[in-house]
């Protein structure tokens, strides 16, 4: 009997939510609806004749193809998924449309499975990716999600028909980890495979997820240029402090102050902190990978919109007290433009690599360089840990204050630090779990390479069990976390099981022996 392998756990629902492409860009996955027909027609019209022929085996009108994709078969199970992005169309909005909250998105990929008949456990699967987005992992993503949904709904086997020259689709199936059975006849290839999760398919899922996550966080940890939106001439303002901390701690790349008021004063050179200022991120003529938003809460969405139009890859929002609707709009806006989001309510990011010195936030100075990475949901706790590290000489490789963690979470950071050569120990201050199953899967895997040390307020038997099962080391408080971190960071592991106790008192020796 084959060994049961639990299915992988995406960050969001299988059928809908943000997804990451292989190049780190974000997009939106959701089920297709009849209302999507106009967008489907536009999508199909943009495809090359070859792409349409590969999917439908002949030249076909976009309108007819859209109707085929949306057609429901009575009594049969059909799942049709779309991947959408607004990274190009949002930039074409008018000011009035932006004020009205218009968020046009275009379809860049579609995938579906259709049950062979009522009660059947087999289904035909197919997917289609826009030419300019091919090679970014969308085919693998759609196959992965369709298979997970199919298993949940009683489907056990997929089969697909494709032209023999459609090497890209065949490669997607080969790279999936499923055991394939193929038959070729008259220039067509039929591929069939069981879709129950296996150790190999789980490993492929985790690899795809890890590659996409790491790529998406590169602009945060290795930005080519940083813009401070809301940079001010007032030394007491947050924008001034952030700009000052970036410059005084010698970030190697360019820093761009953005402040409409400073840039539009008649008769004055537009400067903030002796640096040329810009009225908008869109006016910066050089690449901006990371934008730090420090504006008032009513200006955050407009600032993020400008970042999206400029092609910024990562946004960190220090502004607090956003309303729930503003947070939802901010999250959707960043996802639509393909930007990763830290915050809102973050207190900053520190990168302390040999090649990057980034002190982007309210921490006034970099801690010593070291191999400890830290993530904190509490900004105050995070800054206290950074300050303690600086006072005691405890070296940090990086630090992220997550804030509201509506996008980037500790799960994302764990995957980045897993691949980070500068990091050997991961510290987490957790107040809540966004996705406990996913955290458990990641902690178990990453913990085999690098220790995970966690501080979490309160006691919960379920959480305690999760930590024990995944090998996570829990510290009772911050003081204990510092002690354990120093031990793990600087004390090498024993080479063998032989341990000697040296003491000047019998009692402590007995206690130490029992602990061993």
Which residues fall in each region the model found?
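Long, contiguous binding/interaction regions
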Residues: 2-219
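Catalytic-core regions of core metabolic enzymes
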Residues: 198-516
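An N-terminal domain-start capping segment
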Residues: 1-2, 422
């Amino acid at each position: 009997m084959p060994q049961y392998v639990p299915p992988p756990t995406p960050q969001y629902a299988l059928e809908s939510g943000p997804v990451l492409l292989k190049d780190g860009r974000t997009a939106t996955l959701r089920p297709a609806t009849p209302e999507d027909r106009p967008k489907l027609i536009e999508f199909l019209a943009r495809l090359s004749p070859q792409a349409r022929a590969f999917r439908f085996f002949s030249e076909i009108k976009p309108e007819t193809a859209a109707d085929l994709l949306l057609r429901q078969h009575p009594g049969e199970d059909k799942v049709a998924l779309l991947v959408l992005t607004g990274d190009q169309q949002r930039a074409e909005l008018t000011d009035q449309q932006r004020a009205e909250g218009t968020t046009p998105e275009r379809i860049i990929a579609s995938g579906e499975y259709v049950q062979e008949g009522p009660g059947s456990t087999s289904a035909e699967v197919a997917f289609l990716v826009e030419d300019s987005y091919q090679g970014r992992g969308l085919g693998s993503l759609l196959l992965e999600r369709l298979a997970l949904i199919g298993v949940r709904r009683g489907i056990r086997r997929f089969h697909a028909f494709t032209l023999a020259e459609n090497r890209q689709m065949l490669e997607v199936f080969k790279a999936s980890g499923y055991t394939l059975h193929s038959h070729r006849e008259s220039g067509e290839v039929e591929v069939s495979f069981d879709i129950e999760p296996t150790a190999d398919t789980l490993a492929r899922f985790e690899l795809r997820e890890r590659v996409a996550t790491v790529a998406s966080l590169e602009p945060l940890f290795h930005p080519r240029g940083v813009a401070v939106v809301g940079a001010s001439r007032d030394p007491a303002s947050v924008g001034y402090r952030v700009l000052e901390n970036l410059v005084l701690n010698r970030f190697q790349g360019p820093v761009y102050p953005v402040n409409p008021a400073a840039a539009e004063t008649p008769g004055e050179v537009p400067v903030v902190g002796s640096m040329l200022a810009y009225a908008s991120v869109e006016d910066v003529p050089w690449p901006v990978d990371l934008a730090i938003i420090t504006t008032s809460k009513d200006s955050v969405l407009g600032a993020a919109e400008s970042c999206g139009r400029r092609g910024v890859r990562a946004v960190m929002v220090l502004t607090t007290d956003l309303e729930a609707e503003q947070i939802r709009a901010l999250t959707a806006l960043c996802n639509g433009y393909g930007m990763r989001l830290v915050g809102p309510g973050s207190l900053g990011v520190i990168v302390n690599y040999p090649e990057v010195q980034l002190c982007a936030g309210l921490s006034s100075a970099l801690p010593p360089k070291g191999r400890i990475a830290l993530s904190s949901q509490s900004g105050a706790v995070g800054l206290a840990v950074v300050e303690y590290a600086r006072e005691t000489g405890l070296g940090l490789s990086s630090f992220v204050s997550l804030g509201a963690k509506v996008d980037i979470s500790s799960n994302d950071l764990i995957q980045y630090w897993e691949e980070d050569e500068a990091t050997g120990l991961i510290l987490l201050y957790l107040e809540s779990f966004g996705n406990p199953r996913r955290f458990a899967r990641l902690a178990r895997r990453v913990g085999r390479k690098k220790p995970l040390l966690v501080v979490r307020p309160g006691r919960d038997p379920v959480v305690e069990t999760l930590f024990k099962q995944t090998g996570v080391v829990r510290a009772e408080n911050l003081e204990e976390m510092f002690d354990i971190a120093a031990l793990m960071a600087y004390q090498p592991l024993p080479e063998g099981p032989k341990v000697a106790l040296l003491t000047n008192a019998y009692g402590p020796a007995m206690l130490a022996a029992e602990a061993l």
